[in-house]
């Protein structure tokens, strides 16, 4: 299913010097987001920084949201992950998409202008309405929590 989402270019380099987000293949779930920087940024081990993307989106449909996720190669090869682990973009947000990055690696990492730093995936949203009850219907699991189902 294809859904149109309004996007506003906040930095004129986006679409010119830095490509617009696109799906790499017909089966891709995520769109790459790029660091819209004037100069390279050095991210020291243990450091975090907030990177602009040069884009704003307005999803407008309350049955959708976007999540900003790490790129697997940055985390696995360089230890660079999202500072907030996952970013959630609500349907009514209209500000610039910013990406918090954290270097959990042992080496400094240089982020170049236009470098792909994260990916964005659109997801369906179900808004719940809570129903106050005194008890729940019994289940096999019950209140079993962390580690309850074992390792094998």
Swiss-Prot record:
Q: What is its EC number?
A: 3.6.1.23
Stored CDD domains = trimeric_dUTPase (cd07557)
Cofactor(s) this protein cannot do without: Mg(2+)
Which catalytic reaction applies to this protein? dUTP + H2O = dUMP + diphosphate + H(+)
Q: In which pathway does it act?
A: Pyrimidine metabolism; dUMP biosynthesis; dUMP from dCTP (dUTP route): step 2/2
Q: Which residues bind substrate?
A: 71-73, 84, 88-90, 98
Q: What class of enzyme is it?
A: hydrolase
Q: Which GO terms describe its biological process?
A: dUMP biosynthetic process; dUTP catabolic process
Q: Which InterPro entries match?
A: dUTPase, dUTPase-like, dUTPase-like_sf, dUTPase_trimeric
Q: Name one GO molecular function term.
A: magnesium ion binding
**Swiss-Prot/TrEMBL keywords:** Hydrolase, Magnesium, Metal-binding, Nucleotide metabolism
State the Pfam families in the record. Answer: dUTPase
At the top level, the lineage of the source is Bacteria
- Say what the protein does: This enzyme is involved in nucleotide metabolism: it produces dUMP, the immediate precursor of thymidine nucleotides and it decreases the intracellular concentration of dUTP so that uracil cannot be incorporated into DNA.
The UniProt entry's sequence similarity note says: Belongs to the dUTPase family.
> Which HAMAP family does its entry note?
dUTPase_bact
Q: What is this protein called?
A: Deoxyuridine 5'-triphosphate nucleotidohydrolase
Species this chain originates from: Klebsiella pneumoniae subsp. pneumoniae (strain ATCC 700721 / MGH 78578)
Q: Which gene encodes it?
A: dut
